[in-house]
Amino acid sequence: MAKRIIGTTPKEDGFRMPGEFEAQDQIFMIWPERPDNWRDGAKPVQIAFTNVAKAISRFTPVTMLVSQSQYQNARYQLPADVRVLEVSNNDSWVRDCGPSFVINDKGELRANDWTFNAWGGLVDGLYFPWDQDDLVAQKVCELERVDSYRTDDFVLEGGSFHVDGQGTVLTTEMCLLSEGRNPHMSKEDIENKLKEHLNAEKILWLGDGIDPEETNGHVDDVACFVAPGEVACIYTEDEKSPFYEAAQDAYKRLNQMTDAKGRQLKVHKLTCPAKNVTIKKQFRIDTVEGTMPREDGDICIASYMNFLITNKGVIVPQYGDENDALALKQVQEMFPDREIVGVNTVEVVYGGGNIHCITQQQPKAK
């Protein structure tokens, strides 16, 4: 049985969210199918999701959540070592609607179940309804028999922050201070909420993300912790890049920051793609009222930063771009003791996200 914990917070109970670079038990994903977000009835992106799941499963068990109508299709496409479970959903962004797990020193596992409103609710959310997505975290906790903390008064997505597991949280002002999330809360209120639910002492604020139209600037496209005291940050000197200003600002800010332990951050540069990834007019994407349209020429958020660290591996986006190999080399330098695996995820980018967005790790508690 999985219960809701009322009246206390993870910090009060001695739980913390570990860094992504710490040991993991499994990775959750959600099978894509929306024809108003994914081109050609989601068939191309289902291949990409399958390839991502295969890459992850070399290092960590994968559980794929799938709707009733897609269960048999997903089970057929995915390898036998990927567990497939039927769970209703509105779309496939488990990083944002799934649970953010926390652990304690006794080897126990719990989770944060954030309120999810499709990245902005009725202000600037990407689709409606989102009610099934908002239940995903609770259902995962039931499946895993994990007690959870529900934040009915606080909207948050897992892709909007990174933690180092040692008291530091990295996020962006563009996202967490956006009107469609928690307009009733001050910046200080939001900081306190993060500190209580992630067991943190210090919040590091970047300015803008690189996807204002999608998620209001999630940090996982811009920067992440790669080890205690070390971060990676996207970097480009190409002033024509749509990511230039945000990348330069983030890099400058990070180089001036210290973490919760007082360490000056070591900042690793990660290249941006040489060419923009864009929506093509021949893509067959359904138009549905209430869903953000994807139109010819739209620039997609193709960032190498949206990788997943999972046990002895790091799964890195690839785009068929001339900078693909450089990105893999740079990530390998950040993680000399891990295997770096590139997966072409351009089909995922067409739908507004990438590898980190479509995965959620369950840390090893013991």
UniProtKB/Swiss-Prot annotation:
Catalysed reactions listed for this entry: agmatine + H2O = N-carbamoylputrescine + NH4(+)
UniProt keyword Transferase present: no
EC category name: hydrolase
UniProt cross-references to InterPro entries, sorted A to Z: Agmatine_deiminase, Peptidyl-Arg-deiminase_porph
Disulfide bond positions: none
Matches recorded under HAMAP family: Agmatine_deimin
UniProt protein name: Putative agmatine deiminase
UniProt gene name: aguA
